[in-house]
């Protein structure tokens, strides 16, 4: 997908999937735990921002993001460092009731918070196999995620502009 959509651009794409690890660290006490284990405090890190930091001397990138609807962070590091970072978070997090949960629990929290994921909670019209599965952000009440005032082109822009002008065929309610 990246290569297909990079046609005509001067970009180089490198596969790093096996080299990078990410830990989703979510919940009301995550800031307190991070402030105890990081070299620099995370108090001033704004939503959707990132910072370089260290946990137990290991370089990490911390983003103030998450898909649970609660206070949350994502911690990015080299894959080889993931287990020691996990162990440190669990060690200090135990004082705050931090416990690991699976992806299904996180998905439920995400959906309850109204944070939907493309091709997980709904299938875009370009990928749906059957007509009833096709949906757009406007139909799902996610129009706030569409920045039509943003300059430049993005995939699906023309179709979304048309739908915004003419209205959606249906709308999800509830």
Please provide the spans of the model-predicted regions.
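Conserved, structured C-terminal
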Residues: 1-174
């Amino acid at each position: 997908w990246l290569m297909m959509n990079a046609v005509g651009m001067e970009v180089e794409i490198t596969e790093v999937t096996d080299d990078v690890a990410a830990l989703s660290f979510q919940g009301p006490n995550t800031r307190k735990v991070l402030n105890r284990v990081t070299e620099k405090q995370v108090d001033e890190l704004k939503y959707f921002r990132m910072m370089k930091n260290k946990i137990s001397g290991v370089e990490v990138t911390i983003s103030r993001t998450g898909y649970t609807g609660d206070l949350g962070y994502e911690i990015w590091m080299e894959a080889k460092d993931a287990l020691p970072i996990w162990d440190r978070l669990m060690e200090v997090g135990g004082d705050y009731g931090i416990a690991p949960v699976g992806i299904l629990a996180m998905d439920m929290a995400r959906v309850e918070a109204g944070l939907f994921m493309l091709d997980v909670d709904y299938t875009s019209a370009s990928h749906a196999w059957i007509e009833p599965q096709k949906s757009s952000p406007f139909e799902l009440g996610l129009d706030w995620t569409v920045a039509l005032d943003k300059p430049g082109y993005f995939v699906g822009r023309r179709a979304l502009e048309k739908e915004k002008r003419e209205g959606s065929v249906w709308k999800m309610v509830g």
